[in-house]
A protein has these predicted regions:
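Nucleotide-sugar donor-binding/catalytic module of glycosyltransferases
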Residues: 1-236, 342-351
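Polar/charged alpha-helical tracts
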Residues: 32, 52-61, 113, 117, ...
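Short, solvent-exposed segments of well-ordered alpha helices
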Residues: 225-229, 256, 323-326
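Short, hydrophobic/amphipathic alpha-helical patches that form generic packing surfaces
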Residues: 260-270, 306-309
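Membrane-interface aromatic/basic loop that binds lipid-linked glycans or pyrophosphate carriers
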Residues: 274-352
Length: 352
């Protein structure tokens, strides 16, 4: 059995795909233990021609990494591409990479070495260099072992993306964790919302293993405006899922995910109104789901989380327009984090 299945969705990335794939075949880890699954989502540029040339050259040099190319008959989106990659994977771990990013040479070796030290860990997360922030993702010098998975949702060890981590494939299969294909916003958030709630142990390593390139990933604001109602409906759909599953393990972490998404939805709503006033959006479903989340916090004896969600309701949401608040949003929300985690521990102890 392969140890790692690398999944690369491909769509119109001819400018970057060579660097991405070359970084995969340049890994110092044993290539015979790696499979690379490339999902061609009906790319319209020369991406697949570039990929074919690189694979043929690699195989002519007797490279031992195996390749599986999946071709879509029509463009279906990144979520379907990733799901097809999961279905095709045979490795012990699954690893996602965006096709305009690249891996550092020791990426898989560093991650798998951490697995050998912590064989019961279901997630092994690498450090990343963010081109946009010109900084590394985690400011750590030693391996961090996380047994309280709340800490992956928020704080200095939070990981919001699906790339740059080894994910136990049997966890995905056992719980049927897949990407939601009928929304075009926050797909990674929703995937991780389910994943983090179902694993027992994660490890974060200090080594930088991944280079993240911005490259206009996801929808641009203009494209969102073109179909604003569907975008807002996507936010509401995911918030409904969050509210329905807001219970049990990782309650605090899941609550922060829900709050962050609610504030993004409100911010989007306000931008549409300011910049495209002719577009009429129905906001009451968004207000309704935020209200349901607040009531759930009250029923579950979570006063700090209730106070936090007030920031996403009228009239308090007006502070989102204040530059100071927007600049220090993460620091301000972290004021609610520690007391919420403390209350969570107390309630868990009482229930036991």
């Amino acid at each position: 059995m392969k140890e790692v299945s690398i999944i690369i969705p491909i769509y119109n990335v001819e400018k970057y795909v060579a660097e991405c794939l070359n970084s995969v075949i340049s890994q110092t880890y044993d290539h015979s233990k790696i499979e690379c699954i490339i999902v061609n989502d009906c790319t319209t540029d020369d991406s697949m021609d570039i990929i074919d040339r690189i694979i043929k050259k690699y195989q002519s040099d007797n490279g031992k990494m195996s390749f599986n190319v999946i071709n879509h008959e029509r463009n279906m989106g990144i979520s379907v591409s990733r799901n097809d990659g999961i279905d095709a994977a045979k490795g012990e771990y699954v690893f996602f990479i965006d096709s305009d990013d690249y891996l550092y040479p020791d990426c898989l070796k560093s991650l798998y070495d951490a697995h050998l030290m912590h064989k019961d860990a279901e997630l092994i997360i690498g450090n990343a260099y963010n081109e946009m922030l010109t900084s590394k993702q985690f400011d750590i010098n030693n391996i961090k072992v996380i047994n309280n998975l709340n800490y992956l949702f928020e704080g200095s060890l939070a990981h919001y993306t699906v790339w740059n981590m080894l994910i136990k494939r049997n966890v995905l299969n056992k719980h049927n964790i897949k990407f939601k294909t009928d929304v075009s916003v926050s797909e990674d958030d929703l995937f991780n919302f389910h994943l983090y709630s179902l694993v027992n142990k994660a490890v974060i390593i200090p080594q930088i293993t991944y280079f993240y390139r911005k490259n206009n990933k996801g929808q641009t604001l203009n494209s969102k405006f073109e179909n604003a109602q569907n975008t807002l409906a996507g936010y509401i759909s995911i918030l409904n899922i969050y509210e329905n599953e807001l219970q049990g393990r990782c309650y605090v972490g899941k609550s922060f995910f829900a709050f962050n998404l609610a504030t993004r939805a409100i911010d989007f709503l306000n931008k549409v109104r300011n910049e495209v006033p002719e577009v009429e959006l129905q906001e009451w479903p968004l207000r309704q789901i935020i209200n349901k989340i607040q009531k759930k916090h009250i029923r579950n004896c979570r006063p700090i989380l209730f106070l936090m969600t007030l920031l996403a309701t009228k009239p308090f949401e007006g502070i989102m327009r204040i530059r100071f608040y927007r600049r220090y949003f993460n620091r301000i929300t972290m004021l609610f984090w520690k007391p919420s985690v403390l209350i969570d521990k107390i309630l868990s102890h009482i229930q036991k």
